[in-house]
Amino acid sequence: TDMDSNTILSNILQEEIQYFYNYIRDFDEKRIIDIAMVDDVYDKILEYDMCDVQKKAVMKSGTVLNNTNGTVILAPSRDKTTLVVLSKKVLPQKDPDEVRGTVIHELTHAHDFYDYADFLQISDYNELFDSQYYNAFFLWTEFHARRNGYKRFIEYKFRKGWKQFVKHRYEFLEGIKANFSIHSSKGRLYDLM
């Protein structure tokens, strides 16, 4: 029988969380990260305790957030729960291998924010957004999350053999180039993947 999309998504989620903590970074029980897969991303976010800077951004975006693959929501301070929220509306329409990349992408963001808070030696996430390096950090985490997510996508897609990758490599490069030209015209140069 065909597994329904919820079962498929939850299996992917479990496998990728395991992959993340086995291959990308060590698990740290002091970092409380909840991962939710929901029908309505915006509603789920509103249930959460957010830092003020993010609350403003969320209110401004509104229900547009329901069209994203997922996002990371930061609590007011690093000792509270960080939320990784993934869309049950958007993700089932994607290539399942891309879903794997998305889980890794969002988890990378969540940990990058913890790392940056540690670097700044702060626990209040609002201060993080005001820090002098925030723009540089923002570009870094976007690159880092895409790198990890895209690497996972490619790795999983061609798990049965790299010959297939060699065969399709030009399509992937064309895809990256197309993404770059679409987004760079909007001034978002980090949008490579």
Segments the model singles out, each with a brief description of its role:
Residues 149-176:
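Short helix/loop segments within enzyme catalytic domains
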Residues 53-103, 113:
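Active-site scaffold of zinc-dependent metalloenzymes
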Residues 170-193:
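Pan-zinc metallopeptidase signature
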Residues 11-15, 97, 105, 139-143, ...:
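A structural signal for well-ordered alpha-helical segments within the folded catalytic domains
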Residues 97-98, 112-143:
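Post-HEXXH active-site segment of zinc metalloproteases
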Residues 135-151, 190-193:
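Short, hydrophobic/amphipathic alpha-helical patches that form generic packing surfaces
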Residues 1-75:
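A metal-dependent hydrolase signature that marks the N-terminal structural subdomain at the beginning
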Residues 109-120, 147-159:
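Secondary-structure boundary elements
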